[in-house]
């Protein structure tokens, strides 16, 4: 079924205008009511408010034509109205090919850009996704050491006397490049330095 951009239906079978009584019959209004397009078994309307649905595969990825492609298709249809019998099947097959290409391209971009944040490694350990080159990198300034690899710390941690001993942020545990065999040694070393630093802060406060 063909539908104009305005939403009025055009019937390819009858060219004569229908009487008002036939046009407003309840059967025709019921047939014109759009079916639910989420169920694949129900027949879908081919056009939805100016967009033409080309193809829907099993993953519910729908290929649309917009703008210039609709104009080109309309010009092809008007030019091919004289040889209607031969041109319509080829046009349909071409639309299906375009829809297949579009849906596969959508699927490629989906699998490329929407990666989960945690990627399982080969040996079964889960590792955090390292920041890529496109991510915003905060440079470490010499007079602001707490902005080294993370954003600014919350104010409750900055205003307190023992800010660094309370927060584990300056260790940057999630951004470290840990080698697999010696990761426990690195963590033990850093935790030892953390406790030493905390003891030093406590001793400075007591004196």
UniProtKB/Swiss-Prot annotation:
A UniProt-annotated Pfam family: UNC119_bdg
Positions of post-translational N-acetylmethionine modification: 1
GO cellular component: ciliary transition zone; cytoplasm
Keyword terms: Acetylation, Cell projection, Cilium, Cilium biogenesis/degradation, Cytoplasm, Inflammatory response, Phosphoprotein, Protein transport, Transport
Modified residues (Phosphoserine): 25, 140, 167
Protein's cellular compartments: Cytoplasm; Cell projection, Cilium
TM segment ranges: none
GO BP terms, alphabetized: cilium assembly; epithelial cell migration; fibroblast migration; inflammatory response; negative regulation of cytokine production involved in inflammatory response; negative regulation of epithelial cell migration; negative regulation of fibroblast migration; negative regulation of inflammatory response
Record has Flavoprotein as a keyword: no
Disulfide bonds: none
Domain of life: Eukaryota
Region (Disordered): 1-41
Stated role: Regulates the macrophage function, by enhancing the resolution of inflammation and wound repair functions mediated by M2 macrophages. The regulation of macrophage function is, due at least in part, to its ability to inhibit glycolysis. May play also a role in trafficking of proteins via its interaction with UNC119 and UNC119B cargo adapters: may help the release of UNC119 and UNC119B cargo or the recycling of UNC119 and UNC119B. May play a role in ciliary membrane localization via its interaction with UNC119B and protein transport into photoreceptor cells.
Assembly with partners or alone: Interacts with UNC119 and UNC119B; interaction preferentially takes place when UNC119 and UNC119B are unliganded with myristoylated proteins.
PANTHER family according to UniProt: MACROPHAGE IMMUNOMETABOLISM REGULATOR, UNC119-BINDING PROTEIN C5ORF30
Family per similarity comment: Belongs to the UNC119-binding protein family.
Protein name: Macrophage immunometabolism regulator
Protein source organism: Bos taurus
């Amino acid at each position: 079924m063909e539908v104009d951009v305005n939403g009025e239906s055009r019937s390819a079978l009858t060219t004569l205008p229908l009487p008002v009584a036939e046009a407003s019959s309840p059967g025709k209004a019921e047939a014109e009511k759009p079916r639910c397009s989420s169920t694949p078994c129900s027949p879908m309307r081919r056009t939805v408010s100016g967009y033409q649905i080309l193809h829907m595969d099993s993953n519910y990825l729908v290929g649309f034509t917009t703008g210039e492609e609709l104009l080109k298709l309309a010009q092809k249809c008007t030019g091919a109205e004289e040889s209607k019998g031969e041109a319509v099947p080829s046009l349909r097959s071409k639309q299906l090919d375009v829809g297949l290409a579009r849906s596969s391209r959508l699927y490629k971009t989906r699998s490329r850009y929407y990666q989960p944040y945690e990627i399982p490694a080969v040996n079964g350990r889960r590792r955090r996704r390292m920041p890529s080159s496109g991510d915003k990198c905060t440079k470490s300034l010499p007079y602001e050491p707490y902005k080294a690899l993370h954003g600014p710390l919350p104010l409750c941690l900055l205003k307190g006397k023992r800010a660094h001993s309370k927060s584990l942020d300056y260790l940057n545990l999630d951004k470290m490049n840990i080698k697999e065999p010696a990761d426990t040694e690195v963590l033990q070393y850093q935790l030892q330095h953390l406790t030493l630093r905390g003891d030093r802060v406590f001793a400075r406060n007591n004196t």
